[in-house]
Amino acid sequence: MARVKRGVIARKRHKKILKLAKGYYGARSRVFRVAKQAVIKAGQYAYRDRRQKKRQFRALWIARINAGARVNGLSYSRFIAGLKKASIEIDRKVLADLAVNEKAAFAAIVEKAKATLA
């Protein structure tokens, strides 16, 4: 049986990792052993942050809605309670956008929520 050396496979593997590490600082983009660790760590961060992104955006939307609601004389929790009672189903992403860009429309929604609570 002929002896098989791994030269071609190893080079392919190394090139793949070094391609993924392109743009990294110093040895992290040039040395295979260091680059491999950097790529693995980057993958872990990417995986974690894809999940955290959802939480962070929701928190941002809530902060924006709260600010807009308080300008109109209502707290966030009372505003959301009013929307639920009035059976207005607008998600937080849209509400946050209205609070920032369409202040008059947001104020009208807040007034409806206030009227339902009263």
Swiss-Prot record:
Choose one Gene Ontology CC annotation of this protein and give it.
ribonucleoprotein complex
Instruction: Answer whether the UniProt record assigns the keyword ATP-binding to this protein.
Output: no
Species for this entry = Pseudomonas syringae pv. tomato (strain ATCC BAA-871 / DC3000)
Keyword Acetylation recorded:
no
Record-given protein name: Large ribosomal subunit protein bL20
Q: Which GO terms describe its biological process?
A: ribosomal large subunit assembly; translation
Q: Which UniProt keywords apply?
A: Ribonucleoprotein, Ribosomal protein, RNA-binding, rRNA-binding
Q: List, alphabetically, the PANTHER family matched.
A: 39S RIBOSOMAL PROTEIN L20
Q: Which Pfam families match?
A: Ribosomal_L20
On the tree of life, the source organism's domain of life is Bacteria
**Which CDD domains does the UniProt record give?**
Ribosomal_L20 (cd07026)
User: SUPFAM superfamilies, from UniProt?
Assistant: Ribosomal protein L20 (SSF74731)
**Entries under InterPro entries matching the protein:** Ribosomal_bL20, RIBOSOMAL_L20_CS, Ribosomal_protein_bL20_C
What Gene3D superfamilies does the annotation carry?
A: 6.10.160.10, Ribosomal protein L20
Family, per entry: Belongs to the bacterial ribosomal protein bL20 family.
Q: Lineage in the entry?
A: Bacteria, Pseudomonadati, Pseudomonadota, Gammaproteobacteria, Pseudomonadales
User: What the protein does?
Assistant: Binds directly to 23S ribosomal RNA and is necessary for the in vitro assembly process of the 50S ribosomal subunit. It is not involved in the protein synthesizing functions of that subunit.
An example Gene Ontology molecular-function term: structural constituent of ribosome
